Amino acid sequence: MAHSEFSPSQLHRIISCPSSVQLYHDLGVYNEVAPSSLYAEEGTLLHSYMEKALFTSDLSFIPDAEHRTIVKAAAEYVRDFIPKYTQNVKILQEQRVEVPDVPQVYGTADLILYIKDDEVPEACELHVFDYKFGAGVWVDAEDNPQFMAYLLGAVKAVNADTRGKIFAHVVQPRSSCGESKPGC
């Protein structure tokens, strides 16, 4: 899969150091396939489990007990936002999103949930979820350039009514942030 040189996950670096884009070009970074790590492979595996886990409580398809626990916590958090009986819900998993009018800024949102209310547009809700399965670094959704790009792209992807509410969720089941931090 081709990666954007202005991918949402790189925007923090690019905003902090715009010349890094040229440096990465000069070093040929954009032409290389990024090396994988055990952590990246585990994250990819857990993301694939999440795609299935959102729609079932039976997680026996996950062979590892620790992974089952992590995915269960993440799936339960996300499921709390999915309304039970409504026809006006869009759920998009692993959705490519791009910033409107800036097509070189694109990435993949883990989950977009759009709850539309035709009668009361202000009651519409757009939720964008990003799964972070690592244990080391806390990622905040607030003032996060990656999320700003995902949110703009999600509005476009579902043609969201922007008079409603828009939420960013960083789902970090391995964090020890407690209930006071949004996105736990």
Predicted regions and their residues:
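Extreme N-terminus of proteins, especially the signal/transit-peptide cleavage junction
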Residues: 1-5, 122-123
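Short amphipathic alpha-helical surface micro-motifs
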Residues: 3-5, 71-77, 149-152
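Nuclease catalytic cores
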Residues: 3-55
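A general structural signal for short secondary-structure junctions and capping/turn motifs
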Residues: 4, 12-13, 83, 158-161
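Short, polar/flexible loop-turn hinges at active-site or ligand-entry regions and domain interfaces
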Residues: 29-37, 58-61, 135-139, 157-159
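A non-catalytic, helix-rich entry segment at domain boundaries
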Residues: 32-95, 100, 182
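Mg2+/Mn2+-dependent nuclease catalytic core
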Residues: 88-184
